Amino acid sequence: MNTTTLTQQHRTAAANPSLGTLTTAVGIYGAYFALAAIYFWFGGMKFTQYEAEGLVPLVSNSPLLGWVYELFSVRTFSSMLGVLEVSIGLLIAGRLLSPKLSLVGGALSAGLFVTTLSFMFSTPGVIEPSLGFPAISVAPGQFLLKDLGLLALSIFVAGHSLTRLETR
């Protein structure tokens, strides 16, 4: 199938949207909105003492990030992470202006979720000892596992944004 045929199909679908096409469009815009909202909320919470202290067991046991508390206080690191997360949210929301912004936001988001998923292997208490593997605790196990879905969503946002840039 050549590019002209794909373009014609896209125009036909846009002129005569089916329920599936409309549902997909709502899902795509919903994905951007949801991921940006999550970053604004989570990022904003990083400026609180409550959230800063909640990060300590995750970060301090991580071979990737365990060193940060030697350089920064718990509150400072949390605030820096908050700035990063709010910035990622702004970049993803920036899809309204340019797919270049959401491409960067999606890529940064994917990197952040790969990092947080690594905590599944370094944080004590992920496996529920009374049930054994593969049972995981509510916290931190299930709390961290949800990042697998957010990683997939981040990759989708980056890929969708890149596709939009390629088809301009």
Role assignments for model-derived ranges:
Residues 2-168:
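Membrane-interface extramembranous regions
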